[in-house]
Amino acid sequence: MAITIPNREEILADWEAHPMRKPRIEKVTINIGVGESGERLTKAEIMLERLTGQKPIRRKAKKTNRDFGIRRGEPIAVKVTLRGPKAYEMLKRLLAAVDNRLKASSFDEHGNVCFGIDEHINIPGVEYDPEIGIFGMDVCVTLERPGFRVARRKRKRAKIPTRHKLTKEEGMVYMMEEFGVEIVEEEG
């Protein structure tokens, strides 16, 4: 069942009156956790590069886990970070893979959203390649307001005031308005 945000009209009116308060996409991070190094990790890297047109980086294990046969420092995942118009276009394709539906629990308290894709072949425009196989992936969308640079810059760095931080509801409204996403409650 789709969720309705009670103060949606207030949020939209605020963005209309104050354009600098309207959120935007800072980055889209796509991660494929393979759990092992070797041929399967290389195939995931090739697939992610074909999908995004950008060279992915390898992520290393932080701890040794004997049960999974993982050593500390061993590459076990690949990820790519997209920014700007490239991130926007890729997010449209990735949301189509999940039927433009997101769970309310996928949003954190700062309006960011993460969701998973079970099989990469569900993404529009992606063909199945038997040499590579099928991979699932995690997609994290980081939202920000204009002016968040003051927290990241080197000189004259400042904290973002609470009134300028994004809320969970604003993140939901942004995804609904910008991408036509339907936000659903938990099933079960």
UniProtKB/Swiss-Prot annotation:
InterPro entries: Ribosomal_uL5, Ribosomal_uL5_arc, Ribosomal_uL5_C, Ribosomal_uL5_dom_sf, Ribosomal_uL5_N. GO terms for biological process: translation. Keywords: Ribonucleoprotein, Ribosomal protein, RNA-binding, rRNA-binding, tRNA-binding. One of its GO terms (molecular function) is tRNA binding. It comes from the Archaea. It holds the Pfam family Ribosomal_L5_C. One of its GO terms (cellular component) is ribosome. Belongs to the universal ribosomal protein uL5 family. This is one of the proteins that bind and probably mediate the attachment of the 5S RNA into the large ribosomal subunit, where it forms part of the central protuberance. In the 70S ribosome it contacts protein S13 of the 30S subunit (bridge B1b), connecting the 2 subunits; this bridge is implicated in subunit movement. May contact the P site tRNA; the 5S rRNA and some of its associated proteins might help stabilize positioning of ribosome-bound tRNAs. Part of the 50S ribosomal subunit; contacts the 5S rRNA and probably tRNA. Forms a bridge to the 30S subunit in the 70S ribosome. PANTHER family: 60S RIBOSOMAL PROTEIN L11-RELATED (PTHR11994). This is Large ribosomal subunit protein uL5. It comes from Pyrococcus abyssi (strain GE5 / Orsay). The gene is rpl5.
